[in-house]
């Protein structure tokens, strides 16, 4: 069984007020924070690195941390980097809860999955729009999550690509218990497409951080996903 998860992308936040912005979206109903790490090599943009994650972890403790009364969240680190193997340990040390690497960035994805899991966090694999979904079929049984990009990775604020939804549908059909994430252009207008295809983890940047009513946007997207999962008999009974 899977559950609906909304993961606001901090790439769309006001970095001058990152702690406050993250607390706001968590208080509005977000369980995860999606942290886009770009190195200027695998993708043309450069965003943030381990020091930011380390500092943000102090501001946003892990779920289950009973020593802090601050809003808590799961850190979903989307690693748009060359040679992702080199970055596993440092991101684990600095607070990552999940390490999502790109299939296109590694020569041995299964060994990388094993490395990530050996460090005690979740392993996920992402594919670019031009990458066929079937490359994930052999790897998926070892993954905690698969990510189907619905924009070209590298920059926020791009237009949603609905033609990526057959990839999501194919993954959901073959792996009904797998967390399946979509990333790029998600908001109120596009969430029905993602939910219907079978995605349960929704990355949303501008549509959440720039919303006048963040709780309304998050609830709307979560409800769409929840209704579809329930209709398929896949909804986590705890929801």
From Swiss-Prot:
Pathway listed for it is: Carbohydrate degradation; pentose phosphate pathway; D-xylulose 5-phosphate from D-ribulose 5-phosphate (non-oxidative stage): step 1/1
Q: How is the cofactor bound?
A: Binds 1 divalent metal cation per subunit. Active with Co(2+), Fe(2+), Mn(2+) and Zn(2+).
Q: Which reaction does it catalyse?
A: D-ribulose 5-phosphate = D-xylulose 5-phosphate
Q: What class of enzyme is it?
A: isomerase
Which cofactors does this gene product need? Co(2+); Fe(2+); Mn(2+); Zn(2+)
Where a divalent metal cation binds, per the record, is at 34, 36, 78, 183
Q: Where does substrate bind?
A: 9, 78, 154-157, 183-185, 205-207
User: Quick check: keyword Zinc in the entry?
Assistant: yes
The record's annotation in NCBIfam families points to: PRK05581.1-4, rpe
Its family? Belongs to the ribulose-phosphate 3-epimerase family.
- Identification of the protein by name: Ribulose-phosphate 3-epimerase
Give the species: Eremothecium gossypii (strain ATCC 10895 / CBS 109.51 / FGSC 9923 / NRRL Y-1056) (Yeast)
